[in-house]
């Protein structure tokens, strides 16, 4: 699919993966409409930009109506926005948990429903950004992992419901060094250290996905046909399929990795700082 003159709506467009992907979509000639609760981190000439909180259902509906009125039918919707929260086992369904489900699942669901007639008319595409945490089990990320796994299920239902009319792709980013991981870093759960394998100060292997590579992968998800589930990078795809087909092995590996990092003093998890 060529992007020239395609109309693309992308959420979470102010920072990180969303902003870098929007920049590359623009570079390939797409009309790019951003949605985020923050102003863009760096200058980018969006064709339209809607400053709103995805938890505000009324404003989200108004933005969708405004986009359709101004641009007509859209070609691609990228549900990229996400929020990572951390919970202990005894944490109830608090405001942070509700916000995680709203941003990661319910807002994309709502936005997709508002754009669906337009997308069907254009035989368009929905790209839902899930996470490897939807497949790789880790402690303290119950709301994030559950909502992202539900996002994958929502994609599968849409794909089955509109065969030949709507292309639905789910992507599973691994660790990308962006601000979404700040809450985990603050309580000592460093995903960056978890995915970096060192001998002394020398990095032998890193499973980190560089922002440039990951955004290239998200652009490919917007343009390539016949995709269903994919990682954003080669290593990401390997991790995705390994987690899907060998879950017990991956669980054992993550548990061992957490124990070794803690024993070496490289991981200082502070559960008492988690609400």
Q: Which role does the model predict for each range below?
A:
Residues 52-62, 94:
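The beta1-alpha1 cofactor-binding region of Rossmann-like NAD(H)/NADP(H)-dependent oxidoreductases
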Residues 14-15:
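Conserved glycine-rich cofactor-binding loop
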Residues 80-85:
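Conserved NAD(P)H cofactor-binding loop of Rossmann-fold oxidoreductase domains
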Residues 112, 147:
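Active-site helix of classical SDR
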